[in-house]
């Protein structure tokens, strides 16, 4: 993890160049503020998450993932260097203007396709965007919820590995798990030997079943 302040200069650009083991950037600012995040994420090609978490607050205000991308450089016969980028991570890193995040542009990328991306990172991107929905419109929520509902197991694997019970509660609160997802989650919790997670999943499934509308029965006497 790395904690960052609002203003980040060339020293940070040099510090994070070619960094491949970074997981989270902790930004001590509100997501709508101008920060040095653009400089950081554009010098990190691996997947990284920026968490906007102000001191004294119980939860982050936003968690934005920047998936990995690859840059290829080819020299043409005319000795012109041609740069090509693979992976949506490059496009996510361009969603800034004057140091501020362009949330609408960021959210517009996901529906364009993510089949070639790390599906675990894509699932976490959806999860974090939904549980900390800064500037998230109802229209933008739909593709995130759809993808997350189909890949809850990938998120649970990460959360169980981290023993992050609070985040498991956040996932359950989004109400995206169906019967198959609950069954997969129970199996993952058992494999991880995590009784607390298993209990949370069982309780959430029981409540969901209990809240489902019951079919009406009609009795006819002839």
Regions found by a protein language model. Name each.
Residues 3, 15-170, 174, 179-222:
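N-terminal capping/linker segments that flank leucine-rich repeat
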């Amino acid at each position: 993890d790395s904690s960052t302040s609002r203003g980040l200069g060339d020293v940070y650009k040099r510090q994070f160049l070619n960094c491949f083991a970074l997981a989270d950037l902790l930004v001590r600012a509100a997501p709508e503020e101008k920060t040095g995040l653009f400089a950081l994420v554009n010098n990190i090609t691996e997947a990284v998450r920026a968490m906007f978490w102000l001191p004294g607050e119980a939860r982050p205000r936003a968690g934005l993932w920047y998936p990995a991308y690859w840059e290829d450089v080819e020299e043409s016969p005319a000795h012109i260097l041609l740069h090509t980028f693979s992976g949506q991570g490059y496009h996510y890193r361009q969603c800034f203007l004057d140091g501020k995040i362009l949330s609408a542009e960021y959210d517009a990328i996901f529906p364009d396709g993510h089949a070639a991306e790390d599906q675990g990172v894509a699932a976490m991107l959806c999860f974090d965007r939904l549980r900390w929905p800064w500037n998230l419109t109802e229209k933008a929520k739909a593709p995130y919820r759809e993808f997350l509902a189909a890949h809850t197991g990938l998120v649970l694997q990460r959360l169980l590995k981290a023993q992050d019970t609070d985040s498991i509660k956040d996932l359950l609160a989004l109400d995206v798990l169906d019967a198959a997802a609950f069954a997969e989650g129970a199996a993952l919790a058992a494999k991880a030997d995590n009784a607390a997670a298993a209990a949370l999943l069982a309780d959430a499934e029981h409540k969901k079943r209990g809240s489902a509308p019951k079919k009406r029965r009609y009795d006819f006497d002839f």
